[in-house]
Amino acid sequence: MIMKIFNRIRIVSACILISIVSLSGCQKDLLDQQPLTDLSEGSFWSSEGDAMLALTGIYNGSSVGNNAYNNELLILASMTDDSDYKNSKVGLIYSGYLVSSDTQVAGSIWQRGYRTIFKVNYFLANVDKVKMDAAKKAEVIAEAKFLRAYEYWALAMYYGGVPLVKKVLTVDESNSQVRATLAEVTDFAKTELVAAAKDLPATRPDSQKGRILKAAALAVKGRLELMDKKWADAVKTYKEIIDLNTHIIDPRYKAIFEEKGESSKEIILSTNCIAGLYGNPQNQLGYHPDVYGGYQEDGAFEELVSCYLMKDGLPIETSPLYDKSKPFENRDPRLYATIFLPNYTVFNGVKFTTANSGIGKLVGATGYGWKKYVTEGFAGAQGSSGDDIIHIRYAEVLLSYLEAKLENNEAITQALLDETINKVRGRAEVAMLNVTETDRTKLREIIRNERRVEFALERVIRYMDIRRWGIWFDVMEQQFHGMKLTDDPANYTASKVELTGKYKGHLMTINKKGSHKRGWALLPVPLTEIQLNSKLTQNPDY
């Protein structure tokens, strides 16, 4: 794709149109003023409006723009131990058979990343031609640099070291790119994010909703520092966000992920979706259970459900509140907000059930459904809702700050716990008991479990976490389970169920024991890229 993209660099009008065609209202104004055939490098970069139009085009095609809801990003939760997405392409991932010729997942992420990087490089090479206020120009340059750095963060997370392209290339240059090291990629991205943060505003008016904030640049930098295990740097970065005093922990939880919560001050980075125009096609359709008129494409594993603590703060294995005949009673309220629980959740006046005929198939893959993004009483177009897509929340900042402090061997005090993890789990709608544990080993496990339940199905957070913690292979190498189907598994024949142990009587879903290789923690470099450029090397085990 790098060669395909950079082959176009000599056609200036085509490059400009890449930034224009995805727009709506602004596009008509421009075309009324100037025919497409007249677009040229000299005529386009002449006004502030041109710069803003080009910047909007970068946003729209990026991983935080209108492409953010593409399936291959939403389904990457199924590259973790949290969920099962019953789709043929995702099945390849989940069964351990993803190959370099895949285009939906491995190919799409790579292509979108480098398309955005190319647009940013072209933008930065030309924006100085525009006469506009110096502070405003610095701000739009900062936004463009953020979008490029964000793509490099994503590419580094999915593929490891990748070609590091910082300028518009000639065709010959594009055909000879080699993979930079992971450190080179992450160092460049962090440097760009530092520069961007200096010129980005801490807040924006409602009219600029969806544009990048200072905290977003710092939060992605923090993610990179956690990835690189630069704990001291991460502590400083996350503290800088906290000290901005611009974001809060919303007292609500479920509403944050619905259209009514899209202005929450907890949200640091999101994609602005507009129903019927740039609508979200997934939340009210793909996640909506079939019993309520949706597809229910993705199902949570019992392994995730079991991670939600009891209201007394203890796990189900040790809490006196746990009753195996009523397994969903007295649990962390985030369980009820996140997952449709079979024969328990009531939604739109109807109890959630998964027919046995649907278990293990596209409908009801595990017997559990994802409730987090589905709006009760939704009456709009299911395939084009106005639900924004959240990428980063302030809760991530606080939990990451605590983790970085822990791993940097800094003092763990009750005050620190209260400022971070207890603030997250203490929101009014959740109100879980405070964490008081200061033993470093025990607290590490508490933080990791807290991240798992707080951010369940939130884009790539779980995948990012198990990768950087070095446990991806271990947590994936197991038999996964769905809902409990019987108390008498020995005589149950409708579906394959576990006969003994912790998950006795539960549906046996995907068995990944012995089917994985450690190299599969990374996606394969797309085969088409290697065919175009023989200097690109493939990731291990593909």
Question: Language model features by range: what are they?
Answer:
Residues 90-93, 98, 321-394, 541:
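Flexible, polar/acidic helix-loop-strand segments at domain edges
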Residues 47-66, 89-159, 175-184, 193-206, ...:
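Conserved, well-structured interaction surfaces
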